[in-house]
């Protein structure tokens, strides 16, 4: 995504990887454009069918999950998005499909495991073993889940902090729907928690105390928080970066990993406690 100036106006511009993705994004925006209050930034028409264009938001910035207000407002926005299934028949919208979160995570686990020798350049054997242990054990628990199916709705697909944009009018809106798909809302609340927990020292009790809206999340799915998703994804991304970019990213990722692994035993214990409540 980049800033583009045309005839004295500034725009957000992003080129979708495929025309089909751009068309999916436009379809989603047409549907969500009917919602009030607005959950999105409207699209600006473009002659290039692969371009996604929106008005530039002066002074805008992404959410910061270290801030309580941003956690609360981003969850509120996600809930509003998921609740649109009450007005929009998302399963009839072309270009939207479901996928298995468990299968995706199993594949990620296997990819990490297959590259453990390369990862030894950056992580100790013990750290790699820990990540694989938590990953393997959590996947076993997820496979045993006995949670009833819930309503299928639209999921944003990438709930990283910068896709929640504080706009010029002071409202928080969702951007970048490239990875949007169909699924159960609980699956996306889990992914949102994966993103938020590092910002609160993995304090699950704190998050649930400040956000009673999370009661809608089926406790039987909390085992999914035991899966070290952020670590697996970020390392698989980092290992293929060009050297200069890799060195910069590792300055963040190595301490992030060491810190996460110190919290994981307590997080595991807290999750078990919450599931039994």
Q: Regions from the language model: what does each represent?
A:
Residues 1-8, 139-187:
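Active-site acidic catalytic loop and adjacent metal/ATP-binding pocket
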Residues 6-90:
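ATP-binding pocket architecture of kinase catalytic cores
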Residues 85-93, 142, 146, 239-243:
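Long, hydrophobic, amphipathic alpha-helical segments used as structural scaffolds
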